[in-house]
Amino acid sequence: MKRQPKKLLSIFLVLFLFLFICSCSIWSEDSVTDSDATYLPLDDSEYPYADLPRLVIETDNFRQINNKETKVPAHFQFYGKSKPSGPIQDLTIRGRGNSSFVMTKYGYKINLAEKISMLGMSKDKEWDLVSNFRDKSMVQNYITYQLAGILGDEYHPQCKFLELFLNRQYQGIYLLVEHVKVSKNRINIAKNDSSFLFEKTTETSTNGVLFTSSLNYIFKFDQPKEPSIHSQELLENHINEFERFLQSKSIYNLDSIAQWIDIEDFIRYYWIQEFTKNIDGHRRSIFLTWEKKDSINTPIKMGPVWDFDLGYGNSSDKKAVPDQWLIRNYGWNRFLFKNKEYKKRVKDYWEKNRAVFVATLDSIDSISRELAEASSNEFKRWPVLENDSGFPFFKKFSNYQEAVDALKNWIEQRIQWIDENL
């Protein structure tokens, strides 16, 4: 009986050692399974770690995401190479995008249960997972958002690349992007009935409040989302008055233009769209802000920039070639460019900032190197590199680097044409 305490102690030590070894084994495996209560399962045997963060999302009861309206409850967790890099947290997920949700590789909108920093970006609840499906270089949106920031845009969306696993299925490389919204860390305007974030669109069946301007352009209210009748009339009347001004002789006076718009802001936005020759750059996903403060009309501002997968020649549209002007021939620009002083300011802006636009070539080299390894996973999951059969694919490539080189070549030709035709 005297030896029993020692025997019990030995049994306890053996049991403790066994449990310790078992707990360590969770971290030693490349794949985490259902048996791990605090980790979402990740089987990466077919699509191995490729030096990008990995976002694992699992919907409740593996419910499918099949539209842009229904918010599906889910959980998420970030992974590093062989283990989670954060806790399991709650979110809702739904489809997103004007056309990306009709493609095979869906785009998603996620809403977190609480504001957190995602991959080092500013804290918020609302984020977009952009598929970049028809952009085979996968970098067009990324380099353009970075360009806007370098040029001094008041706000440009922060973004980071990751690989997405949804309901235990690998989905490919996505761009995690700040959702465009009014907030302190994003579009920092007041939240009241006389401060507006709105967008030019071509959608007439979209959710939200729309109005059609005197020039027959469709605009959607983003903030306030549910504007009062007074707010609707305030913005609609202001835009219509501005469009009447554009068609008047006053358009030839630059000081008069400055009473309506932030000229520097409009020119910066113009050049980003014109440089990329974004086919959507005069039609939709065009965000604007305007505020009426203490009965004073502030200038209309353009931005943030958004959605460039149809830029850089990535379209079947005959206008997608690297020569000729595009954006100045449409929308409000076709009136503004009648003013010679305004046109000179546009020319001066390019000459002053040309080096910044040229530097996008270095940006492409840098980010494409980061994506090179993961691109093997992407094009294994979605074997579309050689597909040029029509929407959404118009060009074919033998490998990822060829797609990157084609983008760089288009930009070089675009810069040369602009230089020769200012």
Question: What are the functions of these language-model segments?
Answer:
Residues I21-S45:
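Bacterial Sec-dependent N-terminal signal peptides
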Residues F133-E154:
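A conserved alpha-helical element in kinase catalytic cores
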Residues L52, R63-I65, G86-L91, S99, ...:
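Middle-to-C-terminal accessory/interaction subdomains
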Residues K2-F12:
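Bacterial N-terminal signal peptides that target proteins for export
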Residues L151-E163, N278:
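Short, well-structured beta-strand/strand-turn elements
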Residues N111, K115-S117, S131-N132, D153-P157, ...:
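Internal "kinase-insert"/substrate-recognition segments embedded within catalytic cores
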Residues F12-C22:
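Bacterial N-terminal signal peptides
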